């Protein structure tokens, strides 16, 4: 993850750096592309961190992706993605929108410990169900699997049950 030394971050992991011109950079890149493709976000950092509630940069970027006719793949641990369901539906009607959600444990209390500051699993599950109901394709990532913490048969079975229902 982004804590790796190869990224040469000179601050605490919990500190957030905002690329203030991200929306403008994305628009310039989309304008210059002749061939449409899927635009992905969330591989290295969650696009729906709590600060996104006020910044709305992810929403603005999705609006650009929609306007220019590209597809979108969003990977998050946040139910805040539902705020942008209108744009995701529009993208999906024109191209393709996929929301990928990580589920680590079926236990919300354990989730709060090993994944602080993100939506608990039950909120993510409800988000997956809402996305499904709105016709947005979803993918579930089951990771990390931590030995002796969340690698029990019961936990994995409960997460798989959520996946089937969502």
Which functions belong to the PLM regions below?
Residues 1-100, 104-112, 125:
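Conserved Radical SAM active-site core
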Residues 54, 120, 152:
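Charged, low-complexity surface patches
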Residues 61, 84-87, 127, 141-145, ...:
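Short, hydrophobic/aromatic alpha-helical segments in well-folded domains
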Residues 64-70, 126-138, 166:
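A structural motif corresponding to the C-terminal end of an alpha-helix
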Residues 91-93, 118, 157-159:
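Short, hinge-like loop/turn segments at secondary-structure boundaries
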Residues 106-108, 114-117, 130-152:
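Conserved strand-turn element in the central/C-terminal portion of the radical SAM core barrel
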Residues 120-126:
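Active-site glycine-rich loop that binds ribose-phosphate moieties when present
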Residues 150-165:
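Catalytic cores of alpha/beta
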């Amino acid at each position: 993850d982004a804590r790796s030394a190869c990224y040469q971050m000179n601050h605490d992991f919990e500190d957030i750096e905002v690329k203030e011109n991200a929306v403008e950079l994305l628009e310039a890149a989309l304008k210059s592309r002749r061939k449409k493709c899927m635009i992905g976000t969330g591989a290295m950092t969650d696009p729906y961190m709590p600060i996104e509630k006020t910044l709305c940069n992810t929403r603005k970027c999705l609006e650009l992706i929609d306007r220019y006719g590209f597809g979108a793949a969003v990977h998050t641990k946040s139910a805040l993605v539902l705020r942008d369901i209108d744009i995701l539906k529009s993208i999906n009607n024109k191209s393709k929108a996929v929301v990928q959600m990580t589920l680590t444990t079926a236990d919300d209390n354990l989730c709060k410990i090993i994944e602080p500051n993100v939506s608990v699993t039950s909120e993510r599950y409800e988000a997956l169900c809402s996305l499904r109901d709105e016709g947005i394709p979803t993918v579930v990532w089951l990771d990390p699997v931590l030995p002796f913490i969340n690698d029990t048969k019961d936990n994995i079975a409960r997460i798989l049950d959520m996946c089937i229902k969502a």
